[in-house]
């Protein structure tokens, strides 16, 4: 297994003053992707493509909802042949939305599809090579032979696309890397990137540049790292092709929206992304307002820059920031402790005390914002100061003179990174300090960059102090998504030891939002994790109904992940991290997995949810719901 070499920071010009990545402008029908064009919102039909009228109807409904590009699955050549009639009917209805064909396994289907649509997506993991149940071994010669096979199979499609003015998307899926790529690069983001670049080299050999890339996974952290690495590689080689960004198999409801916000939002906030799709296990029309909201929320033109500092982070792998243990009353944060969750003091509000409990209320025995207390009791206390006020007064106060001798914690809340340089030197000698940034929620606020600046400044000062991520949501779905995008961007980089959420919705709602964001970012699990694909024409059972049934039976379980996948295209790969898998194996038949291994096959759809419950019980992972 080999590793790719990427310079420490090339995926964006400035992480503290983000601008949209400069890309080539690619034509798709009557629309453009990349360059200075607005970020384009797209979705995918869930109908059987051979049901031409149903597919046409859903395409028109998506266009009415504001979808700017519609993707249709074409798993076979017969499905691709249906595109001719579908396109005629869509255009006859007065709809000019560009259409993309989604291809897996079938170069012949791609050659048919390219005749009728404006864009064709291929998956490098299975267009020529594939993943087998028993991975084969390779050597350098057989690997090189595989590269030649890619050229031979792909070049006819490239030439046809070039002749017809059709765009190609080279769309890698983490769950379907081929055995050949896995042999050389392993199950890594390097493998995802190199898998795509093999196909780019074929395009370049044919002088074809109407290309869009994607790097998808059901894990938002993998998504962010893979797109960053691809951007770094392409920009280093002066090949700034545009990106289609998305988190695949995000699921449904608020969980699906938060997971998408963590992955897509974190990238958009760094200027990465030219077209997006939010993959929800719902009616695809529901995806459009979510995607449009993300684009609006992550508008970089409204975000103020923050002074840059050199960072010592690995932007392509997750490493949680190393900090010492700190006790906030009865709560331990930092070190190897789980990232904690805080919310405002509940007062008389009833708060649960189970796996999801209120771990910190964020209150201090004294909050020195406008004045510094000069007298205090010699006991363990928790103080806070805000940097916009006079810190010189802190250094000269009687409060400060005793802090270093007592088990007192001091929270320093940074409102402007420039204030950090004004901190008295003696403050940095205090033993029990933790840091946070205020978040105003106002237009132009850039908390992600301020937290990055704080983290870099602490590293430069040799202060591995805990950092509290403070955020506020107005309680709307959009407010929650914005918070997930901001927090997710930081959590992906290993920044944050406690997540504190406030807002008008109340302590319980804020607390659960904090836990949900941590789970969406993949850093702490406190309820079942569902990896559910959004359905498409390949789906072999009713995904939406089935997902709800499985949720109802298993929502009380703890520390378990369940994948619900409509077919075997990406199912076994994308659910690799899941404990149990529920995958369509044939029409109305389901295969059940434990980890990567299929253990039960061809279970009738009606019986499969109960069979999954029994499988969980057999492996000792079941518990009865609490009364």
Say what each PLM segment does:
Residues 36-54, 73, 98-106, 180-193, ...:
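Active-site mouth loops of central-metabolism enzymes
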Residues 50-61, 105-110, 196, 260-264, ...:
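Short, acidic/polar
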Residues 138-154, 159, 181-330, 407, ...:
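Catalytic alpha/beta core domains of metabolic enzymes, predominantly
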Residues 96-134, 140-165:
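Hydrophobic or amphipathic alpha-helical targeting/insertion segments
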Residues 2-43, 158, 162-164, 300-354, ...:
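N-terminal amphipathic alpha-helix/helix-capping segment at the start of soluble metabolic enzymes
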Residues 43-46, 51, 64-90, 124-145, ...:
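Glycine-rich, proline-tolerant flexible connector loops at the mouths of alpha/beta enzymes
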